């Protein structure tokens, strides 16, 4: 559920305008983002490594899937959403949702400590079993996404037939979805129904980390997404590069760097993300070493800085994310394709087996 008016004052919201938060507010949002990442990771860590267990079996959880969605959910809940908005959170990001609700004071520590156990916070958002403000149950991938479209149409029907409360604002319906949810047929059935009935005030935010339980996503999926959604009248916004990369593209050799990233396969990009700065440097030297400006770029960045630059995707850059969200000016359905990294800012980032991977005690310390 969207923040109530008192809770939302933690970060000044500018939804529906072309302005961005001031630097102090942006710092606050990024601090909240870090808290949400640690707390969501800890929920899963506690359930698997700390909480007493009778049988010692793995409880499970998806730390990498949470990490890819933290920036997007922080931006939405702490800056963009209004009280009348409703949200479906992708199943595997349930710990991030619970962490944010805890920061709002709507979730208890006891519930977090009992995550994935009887009576505790649920593995996937549940309206019937969770104690915090879940708007849509999203336990089976794809179902929550489709439900948001029909909810938007029902909300329109209620208003058009004079059944809404007097003065009740017409909020948005938002789905934060995983890219693998586009494998579900009901999502495309819903899209067609929305086109038939002129759905409005609907946002689908795709956490485009390009990794799933089944493997690395096809390299050309984005173009298919753009085609599918454009055909049924949606506005498609590609949120691909963060501000660090955007700045680098303006420097000598920047065009070649952007082309290299654009043509880099999802599989190679994930592998380099896991391997780190030295691996990025080696590949860039091999492929672009003779390109004017690239040597200077590499010399100006140590391995850590180069890794930060090359992984500065739009879905992890708070400023770029807020620019995309806060510049929507009308009620046309919006599809945000937010490029992210599965496991971002954790040791799991980019690893081929990170879908159900768990950080160990040393990595969580």
Give, region by region, the residue ranges found by the protein language model.
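Generic beta-sheet signal
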Residues: 85-87, 171-173, 202, 332-340
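Cofactor-binding active-site loop characterized by glycine-rich and histidine/acidic residues
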Residues: 24-36, 40, 44-52, 63-197, ...
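Long, well-ordered, tryptophan-enriched scaffold segments
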Residues: 18-22, 208-365
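Active-site flanking residues adjacent to catalytic metal/cofactor-binding acidic residues
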Residues: 177-180, 206-207, 338
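Short internal beta-strands
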Residues: 87-90, 201-209
């Amino acid at each position: 559920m969207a923040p109530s008016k008192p809770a939302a004052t933690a970060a000044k919201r500018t939804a529906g305008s072309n302005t961005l938060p001031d630097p102090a507010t942006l710092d606050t949002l990024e601090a909240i983002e870090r808290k949400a990442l640690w707390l969501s990771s800890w929920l899963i860590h506690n359930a698997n490594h700390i909480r007493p267990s009778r049988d010692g079996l793995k409880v499970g959880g998806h730390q990498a899937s949470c990490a890819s969605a933290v920036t997007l959910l922080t931006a939405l809940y702490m800056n963009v959403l209004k009280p009348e908005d409703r949200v479906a959170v992708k199943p595997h990001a349930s710990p991030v949702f619970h962490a944010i609700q805890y920061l709002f004071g709507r979730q208890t520590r006891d519930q977090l400590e009992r995550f994935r156990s009887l009576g505790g916070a649920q593995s996937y958002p549940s309206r019937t079993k969770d104690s915090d403000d879940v708007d849509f149950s999203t336990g089976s991938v794809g179902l929550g996404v489709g439900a948001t479209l029909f909810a938007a149409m029902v909300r329109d029907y209620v208003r058009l037939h004079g059944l809404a409360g007097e003065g009740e604002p017409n909020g948005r319906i938002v789905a934060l979805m995983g890219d693998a949810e586009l494998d579900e047929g009901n999502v495309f059935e819903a899209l067609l129904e929305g086109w038939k009935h002129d759905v409005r005030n609907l946002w689908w935010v795709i956490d485009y980390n390009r990794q799933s339980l089944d493997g690395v996503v096809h390299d050309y999926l984005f173009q298919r997404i753009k085609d599918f959604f454009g055909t049924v009248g949606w506005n498609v916004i590609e949120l691909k590069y963060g501000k660090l990369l955007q700045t680098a593209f303006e420097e000598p050799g920047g065009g070649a760097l952007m082309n290299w990233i654009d043509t880099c396969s999802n599989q190679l990009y994930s592998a380099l993300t896991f391997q780190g700065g030295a691996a990025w440097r080696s590949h860039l030297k091999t492929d672009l070493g003779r390109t004017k400006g690239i040597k200077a770029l590499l010399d100006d960045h140590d391995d850590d800085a180069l890794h930060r630059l090359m992984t500065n995707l739009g879905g992890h850059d708070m400023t770029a994310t807020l620019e995309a969200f806060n510049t929507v000016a009308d009620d046309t359905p919006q599809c945000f394709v937010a490029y992210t990294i599965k496991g971002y800012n954790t040791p799991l980032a980019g690893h081929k087996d990170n879908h159900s991977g768990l950080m160990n005690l040393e990595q969580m310390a």
